[in-house]
Amino acid sequence: MTLPKIKHVRAWFIGGATAEQGAGGGDYHDQGANHWIDDHIATPMSKYKQYEQSRQSFGINVLGTLIVEVEADNGQTGFAVSTAGEMGCFIVEKHLNRFIEGKCVSDIKLIHDQMLNATLYYAGSGGLVMNTISCVDLALWDLFGKVVGLPVYKLLGGAVRDEIQFYATGARPDLAQEMGFIGGKMPTHWGPHDGDAGIRKDVAMVADMREKCGPDFWLMLDCWMSQDVNYATKLAHACAPYNLKWIEECLPPQQYEGYRELKRQAPAGMMVTSGEHHGTLQSFRTLSETGIDIMQPDVGWCGGLTTLVEIAAIAKARGQLVVPHGSSVYSHHAVITFTNTPFSEFLMTSPDCATLRPQFDPILLGEPVPERGRIHKSVLDKPGFGVELNRDCNLKRPYQH
């Protein structure tokens, strides 16, 4: 079989600081007013009073959505979305394009390695540049799947289970339980600057949800890098009577020794998890060595599907789970092939968590949502990632080459 070559790569953005606010899409933080995701949630910036109430107040939504499309010389296209916005467009159109155009559609690993090495001098340990590389990588997998007529999960070797079961992340685990999810993960609202009073308030929230959801429904806390080891340890032990399943991302990503100590001090049976803001394969190797229970890479931020597969192998070798952070179809096609991913995350993007809204709405067409907390593998049986780009969105292409 003669495979086509890549003829063009294009990059658009929606939302972010230089466009309309509240656009949603690949930057799921970019929501409108009165949304739970922008309510009083603990962050590393919460210690500053003027940035305590809203995450958008310190600029969590300034990047916006990056959309990368790759076109083969036979006219077929693949695309993907992530969080990088207008700056990601510059990186794609003015730097990464040289490693993409002219390559065979199957040269995904070669392109990936060249992008990583060519950006080492300004990529650091992840962030915007890695988000952009991830988006390109996902677009390449989408194109390859569409060219050969197979869903991405079959390109990875096929499913190891018939369906994916999900827990829901949002402010209302009780509503998630009614929808059939296996668990609910809530954001914490207080941090070390609030002292023991902050711990009492978050524990009261957990206790209230435990009473509403009963003894067996999973409850978890997402701390979003807002704590230190001492505070996180006290919070974990205070939540232990309420059967908290895990405590997540308590510390900034570089604090590996802190994660090691937190795992050592955590209550027996309570898992310690992290990873969504780690941005390189090497950082996940170091994170794995801390002994945490679950690694949680975001496939749109960690280097793409190519890196996610490698991270899963690191975790598997240590007997750890890998449960990616959100990412909808881009995670679905990966985790259904991983033997160490028994469940996955669904991020509730409806403002009040009362309805199921696709995570990347409105930028993806055909994006599936769980039914009774599950997605069957047959739902994924479309070429590539099985979704299409919504070109009715206000796509902006600020750079060309």
From Swiss-Prot:
Q: Which reaction does this chain catalyze? A: L-rhamnonate = 2-dehydro-3-deoxy-L-rhamnonate + H2O
Q: Please indicate if the UniProt record lists GTP-binding as a keyword.
A: no
Q: Which residues bind Mg(2+)?
A: 222, 248, 276
- What is the cofactor note? Binds 1 Mg(2+) ion per subunit.
Catalytic residues of the enzyme: 325 (proton acceptor)
| Listed GO MF terms | L-rhamnonate dehydratase activity; magnesium ion binding
Binding-site residues, substrate:
29, 55, 345
User: Which cofactors does this protein require?
Assistant: Mg(2+)
Annotated site (Transition state stabilizer), which positions?
345
Give EC number(s), comma-separated: 4.2.1.90
Superkingdom of origin organism:
Bacteria
UniProt subunit comment:
Homooctamer; tetramer of dimers.
Q: What does this protein do?
A: Catalyzes the dehydration of L-rhamnonate to 2-keto-3-deoxy-L-rhamnonate (KDR).
In its UniProt entry, what is this protein called? L-rhamnonate dehydratase
Organism of derivation: Klebsiella pneumoniae subsp. pneumoniae (strain ATCC 700721 / MGH 78578)
